[in-house]
Swiss-Prot record:
This is 3-phosphoshikimate 1-carboxyvinyltransferase. Phosphoenolpyruvate binds at residues 23, 95, 123, 169, 348, 390. Its EC number is 2.5.1.19. The gene is aroA. Pfam families: EPSP_synthase. Pathway: Metabolic intermediate biosynthesis; chorismate biosynthesis; chorismate from D-erythrose 4-phosphate and phosphoenolpyruvate: step 6/7. CDD domains: EPSP_synthase. The lineage of its organism: Bacteria, Bacillati, Bacillota, Bacilli, Bacillales. Catalyzes the transfer of the enolpyruvyl moiety of phosphoenolpyruvate (PEP) to the 5-hydroxyl of shikimate-3-phosphate (S3P) to produce enolpyruvyl shikimate-3-phosphate and inorganic phosphate. It comes from Staphylococcus haemolyticus (strain JCSC1435).
Length: 432
């Protein structure tokens, strides 16, 4: 990633759009469809770089996967007929692929090596490896914490485990490993995190029960899996950039259709409402993965907000763009309990404060979040995504607060989760 992109977009933003399919659900749909015997079709998936890495890995395991227009066709021999790969399974920049497959592959009686790019090589894996070993997994890594991860055949046991971090990736790794156990498992969350793995297990016929923060899987659960067609809602993490863009750009009025509003993911909607932003959800569907059309209008005089506790895991990936939104509030906002930001593609506490600080915004990083003061785009500077897709898109939205173009280095990082992000933003500008 080396390219530099000049962003020169002016408001108002007007119109109706859809955003790409949900990244979390696309990963999980590919994994579950590959484990099941037979054909599954995944409609409206995200075909960003992260999800393509997941697809390539299952191809190496012997699954036939075809990409067609707005769908993925998975034709699998089933988990018990996977073949041992004869090369490293490359996960690229995808923490989801790396951590979830650490659990899934641990139960497959295969010799595998998982490795990613330089960013993945810096992200902690002990949070997954330690509980997987308690389940009997044979998994090792560099300094017992970093990729590449070496996974060898092992017999997986059930586990009763209290999560030490509020991480959907760790939870999901354990749930995938538990599919191959002869015993039941009970996992208790620290705080409720995104529950796509649980809802999608049910859709692929895998028995699972949930009571508050407790999740219980059944013995030999993998034997119940069935091929299934799956429709992927639009990604609320991608919609978040357009939500904030409309809120901070005078005269804007946009509608984003078919966005997933799973209550474990929709923290940004709750936060915008706390700030008294003009946002409403229309055409809500009543399913295990609900969707809505989200209409957002420019809102001056936003209220400052304290973001802490249970809402943080429900908005963890959106916190950088929410931090930008908070600079436009009428008072000081605070984000707390967000230590997980430190172990994303970058330390997003520091990169958010540093990159917005270069433009004159006033944010103070703390050990677990940010203090954000009302501030303006005061000076022009060349900024950098630092290869983090969400930082790149956040900076592009920040440019709407300036009358001058903004140059962003390594902007192609946005292709990890949102190919076509800039043309979509320009479409709203042109309609306005």
């Amino acid at each position: 990633m080396s390219n530099e992109q000049m962003i020169d977009i002016k408001g108002p933003l007007i119109g109706e759009i859809e955003v790409p399919g949900d990244k979390s659900m696309t990963h999980r749909a590919i994994m579950l469809a590959s484990l099941a015997t037979g054909q599954s079709t995944i409609y409206k998936p995200l075909l960003g770089e992260d999800c393509l890495r997941t697809i390539e890995i299952f191809k190496l395991l012997g699954v036939n996967i075809e990409l067609a227009e707005e769908k993925i066709i998975v034709d699998s021999p089933g988990y018990n007929k996977f073949k041992t790969p004869h090369q490293t399974l490359y996960t690229g920049n995808s923490g989801t692929t790396t951590r979830l497959l650490a659990g899934l592959l641990s139960g497959l009686n295969l010799n595998c090596v998982l490795s990613g790019d330089a960013s993945i090589g810096k992200r902690p894996m002990d949070r997954v490896m330690k509980p997987l070993r308690l389940m009997g997994a044979n998994i090792t890594g560099i300094d017992d914490n970093f990729t590449p991860l070496i996974i060898k055949p092992a017999s997986i046991n059930g586990i009763t485990y209290k999560m030490e971090v509020a991480s959907a990736q760790v939870k999901s790794a354990l749930l995938f490993a538990s599919l191959f156990s002869n015993d039941s498992s009970k996992i208790t969350e620290l705080d409720v995190s995104r529950n796509h793995t649980e809802t999608m297990f049910e859709q692929f016929n895998i028995p699972i029960s949930i009571s508050g923060k407790e999740i219980t899987t059944q013995p030999n659960a993998i034997e119940h899996i069935k091929a299934k067609d799956f429709y992927v809602p639009g990604d609320i993490s991608s919609a978040a950039f357009f939500i904030v863009a409309a809120l901070i750009t005078p005269g804007s009025d946009i509608t984003i259709h078919n966005v997933g509003i799973n209550p474990t993911r929709s923290g940004i909607i709750d936060i915008v409402k706390q700030m008294e932003g003009n946002i409403e959800c229309l055409n809500i569907t009543d399913t295990s993965e609900p969707t809505a059309s989200i209409r957002v209008k420019y809102t001056p005089n936003l209220k400052p907000v304290l973001i802490e506790g249970d809402i943080v895991p429900k908005a963890i990936d959106e916190l950088p763009i929410i931090a930008l939104l908070c600079t436009q509030a009428s008072g000081t906002s605070i984000i707390k309990d967000a230590e997980e930001l430190k172990v994303k593609e970058t330390n997003r506490i520091d990169t958010t404060a540093d990159m917005l600080g270069l433009l004159g915004f006033e944010l103070q990083p703390t050990d677990d979040g940010l203090i954000i003061h009302p501030s303006e785009f005061k000076k022009s500077a060349t900024v950098d995504s630092l290869t983090d897709h969400r930082i790149g898109m956040m900076l592009a939205i920040a440019s709407l607060l300036s009358d001058k173009p903004l140059n962003i280095r390594q902007f192609d990082a946005v292709n990890v989760s949102f190919p076509g992000f800039l043309p979509k933003l320009m479409l709203l500008e042109n309609e306005g």
